[in-house]
Amino acid sequence: MPGKLSQRIGQRFSDARPNAATYDVHGVVTKVYADDHLLALAVQDFLRPFRGQPDAEPDIEFYLLTKDSGSAGAPSDYFAGAELLYDWQVLRYSREGQLRYQEVPGAGSIVADLDQGIAVAFVDSEIAACTWSVTHVVFFPIWAQLLKTRGIFPVHAAGLERGGKGILFPGKSGCGKSTLSLHLLHNGFRLLGDDTVFVRQAGRGAEMLFFPEEVDVCPETIDLFPTLALARNLADDRWQPKQRVNLNAVKSSKVVEASPADLLVFPVIAADGVTRYERVNQTEALAELILYAFLFMDPQTSKQNFALLAGLVQSVACFRLHMGLDGVALAGTVDEIIAAT
């Protein structure tokens, strides 16, 4: 980390080391340090399935340090001249050489050295108890970019497997990925993730890797699957309006760690309520898939990311699934897609 940063927070690094945990995420080891037990617990819950050996050599080191709201603890003054890559209002993402800078107004900021695999987050103490915000808005975007520089690429998608066939369902928030995943789980499919799936190169195609976080569901989905109410996380969070369900408490035997990506299916909610599917050509599929790649335009990894997604599209059949209201019919249609390839 640059000297101007390390000099300022060197003591904070020492304070954070007692709260340390190691996570082995599909062969990439991340060590997380926190100076607040709530921050440490948030990441622990988020990455619990990947808990690794404490003495493992880390590929990524991530420091979570609290600061008072409005204080000068954040490193934003160091990066006034950084080039803005993204501005999603909730999150701004910039670069300066190999450094990446992320600002989340009202929550904190992060600086990361992609080459060294080090990130330092300055988190407003007021949101330390907001576990979803800490993990998904503060921690995940920069951590995902660090993973990408090490060959693991997150995609905004659901991933499921049946009979050895892996299906990637890319889509934006609200397109029905979680509800689709639950319907398929109840009809014999196995889950890699309902909202985020990791993908890495595997020959000419790609391999899907599980990321079994809590499933984000709306009240209508709870109504469809009443047993989910027993596994809800009732904690309130400013950036997450949906309810969250721990699938391990409902269908723990239905999770699979890895699967070849054999099919690419883009889910949309059918306006007429009738489930059906159609073929999608490769050009259209690639143009749409890129939209669901996290931080795709980061110059550090865009070429490798594009090559991975293009190889995936060229190696599998691509479809669009119009999802109706009947869960059994939905699962049957996905089986038809599998049989058609």
Predicted segments with their positions:
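Post-Walker A alpha-helix
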Residues: L180-S181
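Residue-level detector of anion-binding/catalytic polar loops
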Residues: R190
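Active-site flanking residues adjacent to catalytic metal/cofactor-binding acidic residues
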Residues: D194
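Conserved lysine of the Walker
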Residues: K177
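A noncatalytic interaction/capping subdomain that flanks phosphate/NTP-handling catalytic cores
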Residues: M1-S173, H186-N187, V197-T341
